[in-house]
């Protein structure tokens, strides 16, 4: 039993916090016009994507329409200076082609003035992040009795995250009175998450100095995939009087319909001498968890938007409150043996290493926007919105793994133009995003590596910056608008 208590302390220093998903609610906005207007669809009808933002505003649509939208491509750059130690940066530059969407709102039979139906299929999350770097240096890590002089230290780190979420929505709206309308939307979310993190470090002796130990090494490798099907409901109200529009949307917490996945994890310590031990030996931990039933939660949210029309200008503002989610277990490893060989004693430590958990803090995202009509066929649009991270970054970091990775706030700035034809409309625009955290914690450190810390240095904090530029294009076809 003493051996496993000792190993628990060792392995906890080797396993970094696990991060793995896009950590923002509003990174991808549905619909090009709504994206350029930073969420103005909360308060008034913008295009057929209203079924997702505020179904009640569909009652203000003057004709049936089908929208084809695509954020055609985006370039993202994330940089963490000295993220793995002095002179060892963590950085990634990635160009992605984002999936498009289709949305439509249609009158129900001949009751267009009383009822409307909307449908949409779109990408709610599309996030890929990959960090990798390697450091080679000469330093004295192992005692000179066993490894005389300095050793060659080689450290490597890789993090690869891929999160995709596709949503299908169907909504219905009805007119309650001259000024009020109501709507309801049901959304089915299909979420797929892939994660891999690897760290390995080696202290290699100089063979010319007759060492008694040739190599000391440590490695941790964890990989998992998690799949979900979730159901989420929205209820909405829209009020319109003169130049003013008001929208209110209540979104219920997501309900799990299906989940599955697997995880494989491994730790190897070779010729290591843990603290308070006089002997060197090698240790091994490995587990494969299959047929998992992971959990994932979206919180309750309440959105309010308001807009006012002037002669050639529409100004909009909105905000969304997201409730908190207390710490919950995403993946429970159960009684799987991790430390090898398996015994009755080491099962109790598995949960401390392999349990995956999450916790969401409450937050409010806000937005403002303007649309200026140059003429009946052309308008200019612009806006900005906040996109705050929702993870609770707990210090000190508890045992087990936390899901989110991008623990920094983001801010989106949008600009574009709308070109209207007889029965169609084109929208072109661009979005610039910026995020930064000045107290971001290193996942690992190569500085001052020591054997007592399993060939790692003490992790510190630094500044991480993220910038992105995304192109936005959409085409809207009006089904029943008469040609001019």
Go through each PLM region and give its residues.
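Outer-membrane beta-barrel porins/channels
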Residues: 21-30, 34-35, 105-484
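Single-residue recognition of alpha-helix boundary sites
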Residues: 13-14, 65, 189, 253
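Short, Lys/Arg-enriched, disordered terminal segments
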Residues: 1-5, 483-484
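N-terminal, post-signal peptide beta-strand-biased segments of exported outer-membrane/organellar beta-barrel
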Residues: 18-125, 254, 406-408
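Sec-dependent N-terminal signal peptides
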Residues: 4-14
């Amino acid at each position: 039993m003493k051996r496993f208590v000792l190993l628990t302390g060792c392995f906890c220093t080797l396993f970094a916090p696990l991060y793995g998903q896009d950590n923002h609610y509003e990174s991808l906005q549905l619909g090009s016009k709504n994206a350029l207007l930073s969420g103005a669809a909360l308060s008034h009808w913008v295009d057929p994507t209203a079924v997702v933002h505020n179904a009640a505003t569909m009652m203000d649509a003057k004709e049936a329409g089908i929208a084809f939208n695509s954020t055609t491509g985006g370039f993202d750059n994330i940089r963490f200076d000295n993220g793995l130690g002095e002179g060892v940066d963590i950085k990634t530059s990635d160009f992605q082609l984002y999936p498009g969407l289709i949305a439509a709102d249609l009158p129900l039979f001949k009751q267009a003035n009383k009822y409307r139906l909307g449908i949409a299929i779109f990408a709610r999350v599309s996030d890929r992040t990959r960090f990798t770097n390697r450091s080679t240096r000469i330093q004295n890590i192992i005692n000179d009795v066993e490894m005389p002089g300095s050793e060659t230290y080689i450290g490597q780190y890789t993090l690869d995250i891929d999160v995709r979420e596709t949503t299908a929505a169907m909504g219905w709206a009805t007119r309650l009175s001259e000024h009020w309308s109501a709507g309801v939307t049901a959304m089915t979310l299909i979420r797929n998450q892939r994660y891999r993190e690897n760290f390995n470090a080696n202290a290699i002796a100089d063979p010319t100095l007759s060492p008694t130990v040739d190599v000391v090494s440590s490695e941790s490798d964890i990989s998992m995939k998690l799949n979900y099907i979730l159901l989420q409901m929205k209820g909405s109200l829209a009020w319109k009087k003169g130049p003013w529009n008001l929208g209110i949307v209540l979104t219920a917490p997501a309900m799990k319909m299906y989940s599955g996945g697997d995880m494989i994890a491994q730790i190897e310590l070779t010729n290591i001498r843990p603290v308070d031990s006089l002997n060197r030996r090698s240790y091994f931990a490995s587990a494969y968890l299959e047929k998992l039933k992971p959990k994932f939660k979206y919180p309750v949210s309440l959105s309010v938007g308001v807009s006012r029309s002037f002669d050639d200008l529409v100004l909009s503002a909105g905000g969304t409150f997201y409730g908190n989610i207390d710490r919950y277990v995403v993946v429970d490893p159960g009684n799987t043996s991790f430390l090898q060989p398996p015994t009755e004693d080491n099962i109790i430590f598995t949960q401390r290493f392999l349990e995956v958990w999450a916790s969401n803090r409450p937050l409010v995202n806000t937005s403002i926007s303007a649309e200026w009509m140059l003429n009946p066929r052309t308008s200019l649009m612009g806006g900005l919105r906040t996109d705050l991270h929702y993870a609770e970054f707990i210090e000190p970091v508890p045992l087990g793994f936390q899901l989110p990775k991008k623990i920094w706030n983001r801010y989106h700035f949008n600009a574009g133009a709308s070109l209207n034809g007889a029965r169609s409309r084109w929208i072109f625009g661009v979005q610039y995003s910026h995020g930064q955290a000045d107290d971001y914690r290193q996942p690992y450190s190569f500085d001052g590596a020591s054997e007592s810390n399993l060939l790692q240095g003490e992790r510190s904090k630094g500044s991480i910056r993220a910038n992105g530029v995304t192109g936005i294009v959409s085409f809207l076809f009006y089904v029943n608008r008469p040609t001019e």
